[in-house]
UniProtKB/Swiss-Prot annotation:
Keywords: Kelch repeat, Repeat. Belongs to the poxviruses Kelch family. Kelch repeats lie at residues 239-284, 285-331, 333-379, 381-434, 435-486, 487-529. Pfam families: BACK, BTB, Kelch_KLHDC2_KLHL20_DRC7. CDD domains: BACK, BTB_POZ_ZBTB_KLHL-like. This is Protein C4.
Length: 530
């Protein structure tokens, strides 16, 4: 604090030149203060002292609050400091809300967001609604999936907390799961059966519920759930999971062999439309990383459990990035390169495991790149091609060009390998029969054009050598490559919705049924569910 603030604080502590007394009604104790200081921080006091309120000229103002809480709040106005604890934080927020001290409310919200866990998140969710604390509300909701996956916690909730949870999770879990949670809660104590209709109406408002008694409705749902007549949509193996959309955030399953597709889930209310994000798949969970949300850059990482259809927030990236390249290696998710908030390419590398509380910085790339192809090969991360900036013309102007660099991450350092035969970005890479297969991609030539390609190269680490294999039927970039029943497929891409299968014996590609074009869904990213 500067000397002036120190002097004012000293006046406050000793009651010097004070012109107003704040009286705690709860304790009948008085705090002397200065109208000017109170008016600077509190809209409540400012309005009283600068309007025609009856209290304007009174020497005392009575506040229904605890004396100790009032004192540390008033002291904050003089010092800018306050000691917050788990025991006093909610009381401080309540009084600050009454006194309209926005600056301190923000500090309190930051503190309380750091003490959320499974034991208090429901209470704090209620608390956030009461005092319109949006960040606290979002943080509290992060823990709901952990609660509903823990039956011991669920069955101990009271009816009000159950209603709150159902209202929230019905947007992030399928109806089957919500019904099962309700049944498990009722079964724990027989007397809870009288709440069946009350709970079910928060899932949907179907009229037929009103004609049934609580017992009839309970038995009806129990029969469907426990006898397994109603269950999740089965997502069989060898489905492609396509994520994203221009207007609606869809999770869509598609099988190119049967040409069948269905929307597993959609989410646009809470998460908003996301673009330029990256997707990776690990242990039945899709991780949706970075990108833009409602047009703004985000560090957000979302997870979507395909089996139980639950959304969850994960620890954020350390940096705002979009169009980053991602892959899984040794149980860790890597996010490499991409673009920053200024649209410049970056060399940032971050990695994370689902059980970790934060992302960690890895060894940065040698130079900034984006649109690289990433692949896990022999438990090492390989980067192939991409875009980079380079001085290419007579005026020494930096241009964006395709790159032919190939590197692997070993012991947290990057090792340069044999260059890719052609400088490209948007290559699709996959490990198949102990080789890296690199398919298609595009060649960016400054001032000329962007050319999509259809050549296929394979790489072996044994001799660090690239070998031309064949050409696909359709030129494509940013396509999806995957293995179905030990056969290699390529699907879609930036400029096509075609599907091809590789014939290893003939070294040829056969075109199959095209991917359906979804009018409502522009596939920003894809992942394979195997």
């Amino acid at each position: 604090m500067n000397s002036l603030l120190l002097r004012l604080h000293d006046f406050f502590k000793h009651g010097i030149m004070c012109d107003i007394k704040i009286v705690s009604i709860e304790n009948n104790k008085t705090i002397s203060a200065h109208r000017l200081i109170l008016s600077m921080y509190s809209k409540y006091f400012y309005n009283i002292f600068n309007s025609d309120f009856i209290d304007k000229n009174n020497d005392e103002i009575y506040i229904c609050a605890d004396y100790d809480i009032l004192y540390i709040i008033l002291e904050f106005m003089y010092t800018g400091n306050i000691v917050l604890t788990k025991d006093n934080i909610e009381l401080v927020i309540q009084v600050c809300d009454y006194l309209c001290i926005d600056s301190l409310i923000k500090i309190c919200e930051e503190y309380i967001c750091g003490i959320i866990d499974e034991t208090n998140c429901i209470h704090l969710l209620n608390f956030s609604d009461t005092y319109n604390l949006q960040r606290l509300r979002e943080m509290s909701k992060w823990y709901l999936p952990k609660i509903i996956n823990n039956n011991k916690l669920v069955v101990e909730l009271d009816i009000d907390d159950m209603i709150l949870i159902i209202k929230e999770i019905k947007y992030i879990a399928c109806e089957y799961i919500v019904k099962k949670i309700i049944l498990n809660w009722i079964v724990h104590k027989d007397e809870r059966i009288i709440y069946t209709k009350k709970l079910m109406k928060h899932i949907n408002d179907q009229d037929h519920y009103t004609s049934l008694s609580d017992i009839e409705l309970y038995n009806n749902i129990r029969e469907r759930i426990y006898d397994n007549k109603e269950h999740d949509v089965d997502i069989s193996h060898n489905f492609i999971i396509m994520v994203g959309g221009k207007k609606i955030f869809n999770i869509t399953a598609f099988n190119p062999l049967s040409n069948k597709k269905h929307i597993i889930d959609r989410y646009d209310d809470m998460f908003g439309c996301k673009t330029h994000f990256s997707v990776v798949y690990l242990n039945s969970i899709l991780y949706i990383i970075g990108g833009k949300k409602r047009g703004y850059f985000t560090k957000e990482v979302l997870s979507y459990n395909i089996k139980n259809k639950l959304w969850c927030y994960e620890p954020e990236l350390n940096y705002f990035r979009y169009d980053t390249s991602v892959c899984v290696s040794n149980g860790m998710i890597y996010s490499i390169g991409g673009k920053d908030t200024n649209g410049y390419m970056t060399n940032i590398v971050e990695f994370w495991k689902p059980e970790w509380k934060s992302w960690y910085d890895g060894q940065h790339l040698c130079y900034p790149r984006c649109y690289m192809s990433l692949v896990d090969y022999n438990n090492e991360v390989y980067t192939i091609g991409g875009l980079k900036t380079s001085i290419t013309d007579e005026f020494n102007i930096e241009m964006i060009v395709s790159d032919d660099a190939v590197e692997k991450l070993t012991d947290h350092s990057w090792m340069k390998l044999k260059q890719f035969p052609i400088a490209k970005s948007g290559i699709s890479s996959i490990v198949y029969n102990d080789f890296i297969y690199c398919i298609g991609g595009r060649i960016d030539t400054p001032h000329i054009s962007i050319e999509h390609t259809n050549d296929v190269y394979i790489y072996s680490s044994r001799d660090d050598c690239w070998k031309y294999l064949s050409n696909t039927n359709v030129k494509r970039s940013f396509c999806l490559s995957c293995v179905f029943n030990n056969e290699l497929y390529i699907i879609g891409g930036y400029n096509t919705n075609s599907v091809e299968k590789y014939n290893k014996l003939k070294n040829t590609w056969k075109r199959l049924n095209d991917i359906p074009k979804f009018e409502e869904c522009v596939n920003e990213a894809s992942a394979i569910y195997l």
